[in-house]
Amino acid sequence: MEDAIYSFGTAHPGAITIKNFPDFLRNLTLPPDPATGIQQRLDLGAVDILRDRERGVPRYNEFRRQLRKEPVKDWNELAGGDVSLAKELETVYEGKLEDVDTMVGMFCEPLPEGFGFSDTAFRIFILMASRRLKSDRFFTTDYRKEIYTESGLEWVRRTGMKQIILRHHPGLEFAFQNVSNPFAPWCGRQ
């Protein structure tokens, strides 16, 4: 288990950006169908886009309008000034800027300074995270000593992710030297 956790902390997953969907997830080999024996391949990147379309997620420009953001006006703006990417997107979407899928558009957005994902994605993240926190009774009405105990609340107040990991996996202490934020990639030293 420590090896897996160490890998999560030191292996950089890559930026959440266009053309960075892991190749192995774009060409998954499924087990053979028991009835037919046929083995199929699956492109999870395409599945993500298809599911958004099936769920009725608006296309990128409409999504931006609904967030009160300006829609992109041309392919070059969408591609963040990358002329080659702009041409490729225009070809894929057959010149129809309004047809660009939301996920594709968000992956194309330039990242704000210090951000791990686009401004549009960040706005949705904030809305969803705050909604989940506000609707969880253990963070709201039941966040009290009668439920957690006073020592439990104290533990929550004083403990961070680094301490939680080390409490359960003390053998990883070497990996946390000079690590102030365990949610960022660790040093990777052994």
Regions found by a protein language model. Give the residues of each.
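Terminal regions of secretory-pathway proteins
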Residues: 1-190
